[in-house]
């Protein structure tokens, strides 16, 4: 057995969140006020740029004067994402953050979640007892939960094993004028995003298939999901030969995690499937070091499934939903699966292996067949599947591919509502021949360099039977190299919000 390399990461970020009917300056701590560009030209008589503080009327006269002076100083514009912090000299409210909201017709759920996260991150350099958001009517009521979700997600980063953490979690955050329901929903969404990010950001020595399954079991126990874990013996009994082939070179054997949320009575379930390659060396088709350094993130699809299922359970969504995570570590040993191997999958279809670094689709072949066995209304899978999708769409956009346009439209609409950019790629039948094999039913890579994201989806289409299905390639947006004001580098938790919205709206 390998040595136990598990360490204790920083605790999962938890803080007290409250809904307040009115501003109490005696316990406000750091006060966050929303500002927008002035309704006129945005310039004062002396040519300085001006802004308008939306909730200034709720402040006592002396503090209101301080805020108005700042807004007319020329340093505050109210542009979206702009944060201006200053000491007030006021004993009750010693520190204020003016948060730019932008023009009212440009404010979205995306800007709301980024606002909440950016504010908290800007204050995270030292411990804070209390942060109070008093944004007035600067954020639409239907987006209040997004501000809260952002504030929560802003407390999580990739600094899990720093001896001196770069993010200090505030003890409490209050939201003035937000309903208790909005605060509760936002907290649950933010925590679910953070669970996804935590899973991806953990080192691969810890978040291997066994470690991932244990994390999922803990989540299920905490939020009331049913959890079933298939170990290697169960995988053998279920004829999951594709998952076993990918993972057999690793000392950490494969797993399949099934999470079940029963909220919809007798209706057929929706199934969300995630690729969970907890580390991808490329196998015998070995990646170079530069291509391997971030490959702990190759299980972001499965991590997203866990985040989505946690949110559904916490929000008590009235739907039946099953989350499936196919977990394997793609390593190198004398027992590695090889180029030229033919694998009989759980469905009975055979795969010719021409590249062991196209392993995610092989893992998904069996996992999707398990999904089909659940007799679902629809299947959505997520995977960091292809670099080709990043070449096609860039690193910020997820690719959608489908066998059912109505389902794809519903998923795309949900993503657009949550401001998570997606784009549909074609699934023309002319691509079918690209994955046909001369020695097996199909092969695990297409012909040549072209259309790689689509040929990967065409491979997966072989394993969904006639079930309505959408494949989401999140290779670009799931993991990023550089931080932004609203999030750390590393895992992003992309598509958790979008899939929760899709499931809530599913008819």
Curated annotation (Swiss-Prot):
Where in the sequence is the active site? 287, 361
Q: Which GO terms describe its cellular component?
A: cytoplasm
Q: Which cofactor does it need?
A: Mn(2+)
Residues reported in the UniProt entry to bind Mn(2+) 1: 280, 357, 359
Q: Where in the cell is it found?
A: Cytoplasm
What PANTHER family is this protein classified in?
CYTOSOL AMINOPEPTIDASE, LEUCINE AMINOPEPTIDASE-RELATED
Know the name of this protein? Probable cytosol aminopeptidase
Look up and give the organism this protein is from: Rhodopirellula baltica (strain DSM 10527 / NCIMB 13988 / SH1)
Q: What is the lineage of its organism?
A: Bacteria, Pseudomonadati, Planctomycetota, Planctomycetia, Pirellulales
Which gene is transcribed and translated to give this protein? Answer: pepA
């Amino acid at each position: 057995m390998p040595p136990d390399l598990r360490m204790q990461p920083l605790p999962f970020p938890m803080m007290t969140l409250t809904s307040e009917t009115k501003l109490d300056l005696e316990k406000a701590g750091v006060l966050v006020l929303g500002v927008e560009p002035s309704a006129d030209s945005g310039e004062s008589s002396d040519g300085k740029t001006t802004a308008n503080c939306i909730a200034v009327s709720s402040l006592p006269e002396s503090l209101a004067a301080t805020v108005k002076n700042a807004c007319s100083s020329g340093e505050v514009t109210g542009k979206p994402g702009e944060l201006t912090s200053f000491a007030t000299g006021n004993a009750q409210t010693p520190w204020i953050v003016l948060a730019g909201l932008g023009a009212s017709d440009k404010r979205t759920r995306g800007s709301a979640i980024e606002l909440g996260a950016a504010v908290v991150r800007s204050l995270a350099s030292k411990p804070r007892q209390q942060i109070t958001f008093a944004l007035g009517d600067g954020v639409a009521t239907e987006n209040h939960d997004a501000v809260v979700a952002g504030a929560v997600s802003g407390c999580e980063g990739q600094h899990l094993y720093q001896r001196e953490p770069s993010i200090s979690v505030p003890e409490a955050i209050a939201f003035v004028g937000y309903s208790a329901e909005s605060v509760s929903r936002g907290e649950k969404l933010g925590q679910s995003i953070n669970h996804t990010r935590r899973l991806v950001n953990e080192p691969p020595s810890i978040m291997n298939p066994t470690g991932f399954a244990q994390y999922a079991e803990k989540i299920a126990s905490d939020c009331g999901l049913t959890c079933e874990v298939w170990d290697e013996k169960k995988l053998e009994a279920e004829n999951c030969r594709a998952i076993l082939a990918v993972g057999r070179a690793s000392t950490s054997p494969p797993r399949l995690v099934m999470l079940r949320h029963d909220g919809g009575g007798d209706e057929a379930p929706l199934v969300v499937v995630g690729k969970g390659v907890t580390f991808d060396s490329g196998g015998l088709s070995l990646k170079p070091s530069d291509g391997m350094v971030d490959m702990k993130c190759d299980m972001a699809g499965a991590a997203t499934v866990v985040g989505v299922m946690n949110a559904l359970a916490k929000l008590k969504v009235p739907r039946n939903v099953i989350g499936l995570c196919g977990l394997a570590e793609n390593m190198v040993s004398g027992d590695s699966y090889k180029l030229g191997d033919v694998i009989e999958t759980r469905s009975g279809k055979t795969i010719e292996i021409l590249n062991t670094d196209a392993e995610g689709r092989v893992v998904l072949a069996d996992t999707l067949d398990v999904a089909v066995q659940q007799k679902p209304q629809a299947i959505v899978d997520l995977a960091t599947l292809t670099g080709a999708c990043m070449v096609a769409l860039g690193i910020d956009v997820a690719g959608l591919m489908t066998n059912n346009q109505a389902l794809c439209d519903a998923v795309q609409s949900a993503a657009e509502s949550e401001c998570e950019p997606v784009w549909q790629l074609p699934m023309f039948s002319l691509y079918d021949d690209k994955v046909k094999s001369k020695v097996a039913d199909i092969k695990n890579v297409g012909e040549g360099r072209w259309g790689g994201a689509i040929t990967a989806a065409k491979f997966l289409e072989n394993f969904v039977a006639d079930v309505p299905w959408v494949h989401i390639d999140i290779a670009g947006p799931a993991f990023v190299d550089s931080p932004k004001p609203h999030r750390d580098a590393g895992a992003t938790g992309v598509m958790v919000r979008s899939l929760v919205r899709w499931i809530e709206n599913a008819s």
